[in-house]
């Protein structure tokens, strides 16, 4: 007898794992540092089922804690699975609370897996004629499919697939769903550690089941098999039988099908709201709880475009691409290019929305749109160009949006004279100081526009940086942000110009009619993201950091990047010749010490020489493939074991110096400007520091003599001096401020050498009696201990025994007791909140701070100690940079800021501005933030970077 009822039974853990791993590269971390990926993904999946399928009855099955009958029968059952990720373990109780709030029954029976609970209920429901859907990605459920019982299978790329009898038969190439058990019994199931028959794969299993029908019949007729296959099957009869037992889902679990208890009920919205608020699912509340309910349950809104722009982070396609690290891959032979369509089915696109995107390609249209843009207080802008390097890119077009769902694209011709005329018409729009300029990586657009003689003026809002401030560990690209915050799938640039490679087109190759929708979408989506993210900034107490520190820095970086820096290429050529000869000499020394020639660049050959031939240590570390580990870290620890190790390290250092800097830097000179224009990245390091690329200036070695040759090649403009200013011991000063340690504060206020003062305290001697070795050890302790260095680590760094290292650390904390208290307090705060903060409330999330793994937890604890210090130092120099830039602007200073490296600022300064520039720079650096101890900046002058610093 058929029924109008529709029963959904969900396999909780299978879906939770899928949700967690869907976000594995970009986990969803809230302001408390809690990983909400599994919860968010599960809720979105549940909502999608409630909305799309409108079940009349529903239940969620969980595996019980403790072993099941399969574990008792087979100790290795699921033994190879990695321990449950801590984020999942912590999420499960919350997910259960959410399910309770939805008033959905949780189904759990001691000793039986969720598979067996669902199998029992689904089988009984099917017998009663109830249409039943088992929602799971696990392949073994295929054995339960009948006329009334279906698999509701999540696809790898999003969306769902309903599988009935014919679908299961087709996927497994079998005659009956019941034969799924026989297939698994023969081929095994690696995800559950079901052994199967060794040497029998899927195709062989299909062939055997097609011929014999079942494992039992196969084992009774092994005489019909031949050769190696016969031997395999006969040798493993017991294992095959046992594997089938493990793969068989039980349908007689002691649980009753009580349909009245599975009826879908109205959710407890107050409870859901409370949980979602605690998890900081603010926009999920808008999408799930503030819309009309249907069919007695909470459902997702279908949403207009306006609603979409304000909607919650909806899942990326919940089920990642094939080959990802996920549990229970559903049918190993599933294939297909479903990604694009499946993804679009879950997200809004331009095709599903009513947007007014206009191509502005006549003088009349341009004049009209300019007047319209000038009246707006907010302007979202974007540029289309010929390349990704802003100093070389040519404008192809400009797009603008001032109202959601409306945008305008202005093509710019190839002819530079004509292009300048059009861009110049829009100068009043860009230079209108009364309108807020919104962009996604707006620094790029500003540099491109300045190459056309136009400055972007007025307050700025960069959506990429806004998201970085909120979630520094995640990606910040527009496509990703649109999916997460707007539930929207953007047009990808590859759809216009093709995939990367030699055949990829240029935007200039396309007709404006083929570009304008893409370009308009960029400006429109950026405006929508701004409207969402500005609320998030306010709710997360991040407005000061964003508006007062990060945004004022953008025009500074535009200026630095456009200024560029000159290189003394002749000096680099001479250095190249010198270091190449030095490398060749060291090579010969290495061969003599080793007693043979070998490829020094080959880690394999280096390992064989060091550990097989020279046997410098007894037990050398190896990789999984059996190759010796010869990393820099390993060789550093072995430096004292044999002279050849020192030489190999020296050789590697020179090779890196040549390849990364000395020979590479001249290749980065822009032929148009004759300068190197490094790119400064505001959204890369989670610490808040700036990073740089092309070239990476942050990693230039500065302590050894060889590294100094690189700095010598950086020179000022003609008729100018090179000026360098850097903070003195800023991180120690911040530690003194944060810890409020009286002894450390007194040392700084007395203007003592902090390392000598520390040594005097530790060794209990007068300051005048501190020798160079004592000071060196105290300096190592000062910088090492604030980074949470261990006794072992300090001993290694100082090349002393652990007893002396421990005494030094104990003496340090006795000298600065409040420093130790600060360190302990920082860890405690991180454990309670999941994050720590800088002076300016920049958050560093530490999801592993409560990990049960001591190594992982220890790393998080060290970050808890150091992140507020390092991050505050980064914030302070950003403040100083913005203020110096403003002073230069208002006072008409011609000097240029040309480089920033960690705590150091560098300038090209006309000789006649020498005294004034030094005065401004030092004043602004030392007054960037008021602390318990003064900030101090040292400076120097020269004809190159090396002389100045």
Model-derived segments and spans:
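Short hydrophobic beta-strand that contains or immediately precedes a catalytic carboxylate
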Residues: 9-10, 134-136, 379-381, 460-461, ...
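Active-site palm subdomain of RNA-directed nucleic acid polymerases
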Residues: 537-549, 553, 876, 880-901, ...
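Conserved "right-hand" nucleotidyltransferase catalytic core of DNA-directed polymerases
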Residues: 236-413, 440, 473, 481, ...
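Conserved RNase H-like, two-metal-ion catalytic cores of nucleic-acid enzymes
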Residues: 7-8, 18-57, 75-76, 80-87, ...
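Conserved catalytic core of nucleic-acid polymerases
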Residues: 505-508, 562, 670, 677-678, ...
């Amino acid at each position: 007898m058929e029924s109008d009822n529709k029963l959904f039974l969900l396999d909780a853990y299978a879906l939770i794992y899928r949700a967690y791993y869907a976000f594995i590269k970009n986990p969803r971390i809230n302001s408390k540092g809690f990983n909400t990926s599994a919860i968010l993904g599960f809720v979105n999946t549940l909502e999608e089922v409630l909305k799309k399928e409108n079940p009349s009855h529903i239940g969620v099955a969980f595996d019980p804690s403790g072993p099941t009958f399969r574990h008792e029968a087979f100790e290795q059952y699921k033994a190879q699975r990695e321990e449950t990720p801590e984020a999942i373990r912590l999420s499960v109780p919350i997910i259960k609370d959410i399910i309770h709030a939805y008033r959905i029954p949780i189904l759990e029976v001691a000793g039986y897996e969720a598979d067996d609970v669902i199998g029992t209920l689904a089988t009984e429901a099917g017998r009663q004629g109830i249409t039943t859907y088992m929602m799971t990605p696990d392949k073994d459920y295929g054995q339960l499919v009948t006329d009334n019982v279906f698999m509701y299978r999540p696809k790898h790329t999003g969306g769902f697939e309903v599988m009935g009898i014919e679908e299961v038969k087709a996927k497994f190439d079998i005659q009956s769903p019941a034969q799924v058990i026989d297939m698994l019994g023969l081929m095994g199931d690696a995800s559950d550690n079901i052994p199967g028959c060794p040497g029998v794969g899927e195709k062989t299993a299909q062939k055997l089941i097609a011929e014999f029908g079942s494992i039992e019949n196969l084992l009774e007729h092994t005489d019909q098999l031949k050769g190696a296959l016969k031997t395999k099957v006969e040798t493993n009869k017991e294992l095959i039988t046992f594997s089938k037992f493990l793969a068989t889902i039980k349908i007689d679990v002691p649980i009753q099908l009580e349909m009245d208890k599975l009826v879908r009920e109205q959710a407890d919205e107050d409870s859901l709201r409370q949980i979602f608020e605690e998890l900081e699912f603010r926009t999920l509340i808008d999408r799930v709880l503030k819309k009309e309910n249907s069919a007695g349950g909470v459902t997702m809104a279908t949403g207009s475009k306006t609603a979409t722009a304000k909607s919650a982070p909806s899942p990326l396609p919940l089920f990642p691409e094939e080959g990802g690290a996920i549990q229970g891959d559903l049918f190993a032979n599933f294939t297909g290019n479903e990604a694009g369509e499946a993804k679009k089915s879950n997200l809004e696109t331009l095709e599903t929305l009513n947007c007014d995107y206009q191509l502005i390609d006549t003088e009349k249209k341009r004049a009209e749109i300019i007047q319209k843009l000038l009246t707006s207080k907010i302007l979202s802008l974007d540029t289309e160009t010929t390349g990704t390097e802003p100093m070389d890119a040519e404008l192809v077009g400009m797009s603008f949006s001032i109202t959601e769902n409306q945008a305008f694209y202005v093509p710019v011709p190839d002819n530079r004279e004509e292009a300048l005329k059009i861009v110049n018409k829009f100068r009043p729009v860009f230079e209108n100081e009364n309108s807020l300029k919104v962009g996604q990586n707006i620094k790029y657009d500003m540099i491109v526009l300045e190459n056309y003689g136009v400055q972007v003026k007025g307050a700025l809002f960069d959506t990429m940086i806004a998201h970085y401030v909120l979630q520094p560990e995640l990606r910040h690209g527009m496509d990703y942000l649109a999916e997460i915050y707007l539930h929207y799938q953007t047009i990808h640039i590859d759809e216009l110009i093709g995939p990367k490679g030699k055949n990829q087109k240029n935007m200039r190759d396309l007709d404006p009619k083929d570009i304008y929708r893409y370009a308009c979408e960029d400006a429109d989506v950026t405006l929508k993201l701004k409207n969402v993210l500005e609320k998030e900034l306010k709710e997360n107490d991040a407005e000061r950091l964003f508006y007062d520190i990060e945004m004022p820095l953008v025009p500074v970086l535009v200026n630095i990047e456009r200024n560029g820096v000159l290189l003394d290429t002749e000096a680099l050529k001479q250095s190249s010749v010198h270091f190449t000869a030095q490398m060749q000499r060291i090579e010969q020394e290495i061969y003599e010490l080793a007693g043979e020639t070998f490829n020094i660049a080959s880690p394999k050959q280096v390992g064989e020489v060091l550990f097989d031939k020279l046997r410098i240590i007894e037990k050398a570390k190896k990789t999984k493939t059996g190759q010796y580990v010869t990393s820099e870290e390993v060789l550093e620890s072995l430096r004292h074991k044999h002279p050849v190790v020192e030489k190999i390290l020296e050789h590697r250092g020179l090779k890196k110096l040549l390849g990364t800097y000395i020979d590479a830097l001249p290749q980065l000179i822009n032929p148009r400007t004759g300068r190197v224009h490094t790119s400064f990245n505001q959204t890369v390091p989670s610490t808040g520091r700036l990073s740089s690329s092309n070239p990476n200036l942050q990693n230039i070695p500065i302590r050894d003599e060889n590294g100094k040759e690189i700095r010598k090649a950086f020179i000022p403009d003609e008729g100018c001096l090179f000026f360098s200013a850097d903070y003195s011991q800023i991180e120690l000063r911040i530690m003194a401020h944060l810890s409020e340690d009286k002894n450390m504060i007194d040392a700084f206020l007395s203007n003592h050498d902090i390392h000598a003062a520390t040594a005097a305290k530790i060794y209990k001697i007068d300051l005048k009696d501190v020798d160079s070795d004592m000071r060196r050890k105290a300096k190592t302790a000062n910088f090492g201990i604030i980074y949470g260095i261990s006794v072992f680590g300090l001993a290694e760094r100082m090349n002393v025994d652990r007893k002396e290292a421990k005494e030094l650390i104990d003496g340090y904390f006795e000298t600065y007791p409040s420093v130790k208290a600060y360190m302990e307090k920082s860890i405690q705060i991180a454990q309670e909140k999941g994050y720590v903060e800088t002076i300016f409330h920049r958050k560093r999330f530490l999801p592993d701070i409560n990990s049960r793994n001591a190594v992982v937890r220890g790393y998080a604890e060290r970050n808890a100690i150091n992140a507020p210090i390092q991050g505050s130092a980064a914030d302070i120099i950003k403040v100083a940079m913005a203020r110096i830039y403003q002073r230069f602007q208002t006072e008409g200073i011609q000097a240029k800021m040309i480089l920033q490296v960690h705590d150091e600022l560098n300038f090209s300064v006309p000789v006649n501005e020498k005294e004034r520039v030094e005065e401004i720079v030092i004043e602004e650096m030392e007054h960037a933030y008021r602390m318990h101890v003064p900030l101090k900046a040292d400076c120097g002058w020269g004809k190159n970077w090396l002389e100045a610093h």
